[in-house]
Curated annotation (Swiss-Prot):
Keyword Oxidoreductase: yes
Keyword Ribonucleoprotein carried by entry: no
Subunit structure: Heterotetramer of one alpha, one beta, one delta and one gamma chain.
NCBIfam families tied to this protein: PorC_KorC, PorC_Meth_Thtga, PRK08534.1
Catalytic activity: 2 oxidized [2Fe-2S]-[ferredoxin] + pyruvate + CoA = 2 reduced [2Fe-2S]-[ferredoxin] + acetyl-CoA + CO2 + H(+)
Family matches, as InterPro entries: Oxidoreductase_gamma_subunit, PorC_KorC, Pyruvate_synthase_PorC, Pyrv/ketoisovalerate_OxRed_cat, Pyrv_flavodox_OxRed_cen
Chain segments annotated as transmembrane: none
Enzyme category, top tier: oxidoreductase
Stated name of the protein: Pyruvate synthase subunit PorC
EC number: 1.2.7.1
Key words, A-Z: Oxidoreductase
Organism the protein comes from: Methanothermobacter thermautotrophicus (strain ATCC 29096 / DSM 1053 / JCM 10044 / NBRC 100330 / Delta H) (Methanobacterium thermoautotrophicum)
Amino acid sequence: MIEIRFHGRGGQGAVTAAEILAKAAFEDGKYSQAFPFFGVERRGAPVMAFTRIDDSPVRRRYQVYNPDYVVVLDEGLVDVVDVFSGLKDDGVVVLNKSGDFQGGDVKVHTIDATGIALETLGRPIVNTVMLGAFAGVTGLVSIDSLIKIIKETFPGKIGEKNAEAARMAYEEIEKLRVNM
């Protein structure tokens, strides 16, 4: 079973990202589950959401403590929350940050999701950008399934722009992979 933990701030779309990822995995023929972790959070407060993906039914109903992957929508959370907590030894982090990040022993992939979101959406809402990057880094879901679910989640022009943002992030990761 693959377990993913999302870190974001209230209003950034971490919960929606976890749900879209689960639906894209289902679209690809996997079993999946997504759920949020809420306390008394308000807009701007740190939030977590989780996705599990497997080839067999997912029966666990508790938060993810030892993720295979961590997706961080807001770089500032690295200084506020231990986003690396419980990450498996071979775990991978996808971080919204322009430039490199020194994660010590942790494998961190960075992408300027905020820049892509501003360019495509005109707003710094990065959840779909980060999903495109995640798909590119991990290959756990196909970009086609991801884009299909994004368009179903956000109909019309908003969906088209979010799909474009996800594809841009995916292609940026692919370029980095080719140039490695």
